[in-house]
Amino acid sequence: MRHRHGLRKLNRTSEHRLAMLRNMANSLIQSEAIKTTVPKAKELRRVVEPLITLAKEPTLANRRLAFDRTRDRDVVAKLFNDLGPRYKARPGGYTRILKMGFRVGDNAPMAFVELVDRPEPAAQAPAEATE
């Protein structure tokens, strides 16, 4: 019986699923926003949120745990130097999933996953038309 098994398999082997979620988490932490399918986005939330919670307390043990889960030093540095202090006062809910229609090829439901309270990119002034 399949009672209380909450993990989505995403039609992949366990190694493939783990590697895919690790890569997606690294991409989300680096760029702070990615586009993916809705089921992947919902699973990604379960990976990224505990990482940011770890980064809120910058101990050596937490850095080692984060590196063990991400396997990327740049991602760990951004987590502990940038995201941990940013979300220090927030008690969870660091990601936002926005549904954005369906993919053209296979009609898969797509979503935009972003970190909340991320700094907006600086808007460039419109170029003046020279005559």
Curated annotation (Swiss-Prot):
Record-level GO cellular component terms: cytosolic large ribosomal subunit
PROSITE patterns with a match to the protein in the record: RIBOSOMAL_L17 (PS01167)
Organism, scientific name: Methylibium petroleiphilum (strain ATCC BAA-1232 / LMG 22953 / PM1)
Alphabetic keyword roster: Ribonucleoprotein, Ribosomal protein
Name of the protein: Large ribosomal subunit protein bL17
Gene Ontology biological-process annotations: translation
Subunit-level organization: Part of the 50S ribosomal subunit. Contacts protein L32.
Keyword set includes Transmembrane: no
Coiled-coil annotated spans: none
